[in-house]
Curated annotation (Swiss-Prot):
EC number of the protein: 2.1.1.170
Entry similarity comment: Belongs to the methyltransferase superfamily. RNA methyltransferase RsmG family.
Major localization class: cytoplasm
Gene name linked to the record: rsmG
Protein's organism: Azoarcus sp. (strain BH72)
One Gene Ontology term, aspect cellular component: cytosol
Entry superkingdom: Bacteria
UniProt protein name: Ribosomal RNA small subunit methyltransferase G
Length: 212
């Protein structure tokens, strides 16, 4: 039995609590990704989270909590994605979504490439690059990150990836009013969504930032 299999029920319950309809086979792929993350983490130090139940809550369910707010997004860039979060779970659940995952640390990008191969994620492309140097062939209608400590940095480094009508999606803890006040000119918070992540006893918010 795999390490995460005993927690498959917790994942299923969390998905139901989020109001999401994800097939059992797709949930099994999410578990398989979590297994890979735990396995590679022993050598590569991809995440500080090592407890299987926390992989379910802090990584998988936390990533899936943003799904309802990305329904209009077709091409998504995940910036500073580390072990592929939230990009890989989103790519697993939405196979029609094109996901570009940008990570500066080579070993983390290498893990993402291995996960892409093992999980057969044709819609997921990891890039070992700095986001400010990235020049995609076509703009993204969504750019997401849960890595940036500052909204200002997120906008200044990643804003050039956003196409007309697109937006930046910042996954944060407590709503960062001071960071919102420091946003660069020409950018505004279009919406703030509180995220109730099942099993996670912490405030989470998704801020949608767009030009205007």
């Amino acid at each position: 039995m795999s390490v995460l299999t005993p927690y498959a029920g917790r994942l299923a319950d969390g998905i139901a609590a989020l109001g999401l309809d994800i097939p059992t086979a797709t949930q099994a792929r999410l578990i398989a990704f979590g297994e890979l993350l735990l396995k590679w983490n022993k050598v590569y130090n991809l995440t500080a989270i090592r407890a299987p139940q926390e992989v379910i809550t802090h990584h998988l369910l936390d990533s899936l909590a943003v799904l309802p707010y990305l329904s209009a997004v077709t091409r998504l860039a995940d910036i500073g994605s580390g072990g592929g979060l939230p990009g890989i779970p989103l790519a697993i659940v939405r196979p029609e979504l094109s996901v570009i995952s940008v990570e500066t640390v080579n070993k983390k990008a290498s893990f993402q490439q291995q996960a892409k191969i093992e999980l057969g994620l044709g819609n997921f492309q990891p890039l070992n690059a700095r986001v400010e140097n990235l020049k995609p062939e076509q703009p993204c209608d969504g750019v997401i990150s849960r890595a940036f400590s500052s909204l200002k940095d997120f906008v200044e480094l990643s804003g050039h990836l956003v196409g007309d009508g697109g937006a930046l999606y910042a996954m944060k803890g407590v709503r960062p009013d001071d960071e919102v006040a420091a946003l660069p000119a020409g950018w505004t918070v279009r919406a703030t969504h509180p995220l109730a992540v099942p099993g996670l006893d912490a405030e989470r918010h998704l801020l949608v930032i767009a030009r205007g």
